[in-house]
Amino acid sequence: MAKVESFTLDHTAVKAPYVRLITVETGAKGDKISNFDLRFVQPNENAIPTAGLHTIEHMLAGYLRDHMDGVIDCSPFGCRTGFHLIMWGEHDTTEVATALKASLNDIINASWEDVQGTDIKSCGNYRDHSLFSAQEWCKKILADGISTDPFERKVI
């Protein structure tokens, strides 16, 4: 089985919340994609409940695109401690952390009408959403401060 980078990361050494560049890969035609670890809570100490995480996912899908170009996808980790962010091109952790901070503030200030994809036609699990949970977790993440380094706190 192929080695997966995220399973080689020492989860006991990181200090969440942070943005970490996992890799930049180059395709056959020279196009580059960047993969980031957006870690919201400390691994093995906390996890965001699925309803809040699901709503954060739906809202980040729009808000991150509002704050920076090149977003391909932002998907939650199965462990519920954060997200993978896949982007076209090369970006640094400061740019991503700044856009993430703005996006989390947008979520805090949002109303239910701002949440996209919350009905049976637009979501595969539309019953599992909580804007209240999403907003409370976003407040905590921002209060803890988003670092541009996973091992040393460099809060933006």
Swiss-Prot record:
Functional description taken from the UniProt entry:
Involved in the synthesis of autoinducer 2 (AI-2) which is secreted by bacteria and is used to communicate both the cell density and the metabolic potential of the environment. The regulation of gene expression in response to changes in cell density is called quorum sensing. Catalyzes the transformation of S-ribosylhomocysteine (RHC) to homocysteine (HC) and 4,5-dihydroxy-2,3-pentadione (DPD).
E.C. number:
4.4.1.21
Q: Does Isomerase show up as a keyword for this record?
A: no
User: Does the record carry Metal-binding as a key word?
Assistant: yes
Print the keywords alphabetically.
Answer: Autoinducer synthesis, Iron, Lyase, Metal-binding, Quorum sensing
Query: Bound how, and how many: what does the cofactor note say?
Result: Binds 1 Fe cation per subunit.
The protein's GO terms of the molecular function aspect are: iron ion binding; S-ribosylhomocysteine lyase activity
Under which name does UniProt file this protein?
A: S-ribosylhomocysteine lyase
Could you tell me which species this protein originates from?
Ligilactobacillus salivarius (strain UCC118)
Q: Assembly and partners? A: Homodimer.
Pfam entry (one): LuxS
Q: Which reaction does it catalyse?
A: S-(5-deoxy-D-ribos-5-yl)-L-homocysteine = (S)-4,5-dihydroxypentane-2,3-dione + L-homocysteine
Residue ranges the record marks as coiled coil = none
Name the SUPFAM superfamilies for this protein.
LuxS/MPP-like metallohydrolase
Q: Name one GO biological process term.
A: quorum sensing
